[in-house]
Amino acid sequence: MPRHSRGKSSSSASGASQRQLRVGELIRHAMADILAQGGVHDDTLAGHIITVPEVRMSPDLKLATVYVMPLGGHDTEAVLAALAHNKKFLRGEVAHRVNLKFAPELRFRVDERFDEAERIEKLLRTPAVQRDLNSDSDDNA
């Protein structure tokens, strides 16, 4: 009879734990508020509307990877550089807003899911794929 381990949950192998997800969501809300309210005094960040679609936490909650996307997708490199330049300030602001034992180190990445979804949509609209989809529906009828 197999023994069940009580230490780590099996969800850690397949994805983030419930706590990682909860803390990531708290930090995402805090970062979105800070950026929306213009809390960072930086010309590059002030000139862009930045969305924060996701924050992924490390298992020890000491590292937060913040996925960002400037509205319109323009100047992503400049926005990432400005966020990296101001990450100490942002870390302090997050620490004030989210009650954690340690303020996590922030790493910023561009969220490329929107670009990937657009690429797939374009691919699905190509004539060759449309022809295949239509022939499959004709075969099933």
UniProtKB/Swiss-Prot annotation:
Monomer. Binds 30S ribosomal subunits, but not 50S ribosomal subunits or 70S ribosomes. The gene is rbfA. Pfam families: RBFA. Belongs to the RbfA family. GO terms for cellular component: cytosol. Keywords: Cytoplasm, Ribosome biogenesis. One of its GO terms (molecular function) is ribosomal small subunit binding. GO terms for biological process: maturation of SSU-rRNA. Gene3D superfamilies: 3.30.300.20. One of several proteins that assist in the late maturation steps of the functional core of the 30S ribosomal subunit. Associates with free 30S ribosomal subunits (but not with 30S subunits that are part of 70S ribosomes or polysomes). Required for efficient processing of 16S rRNA. May interact with the 5'-terminal helix region of 16S rRNA. It is found in: Cytoplasm. It comes from the Bacteria. Signal peptide: none annotated. This is Ribosome-binding factor A.
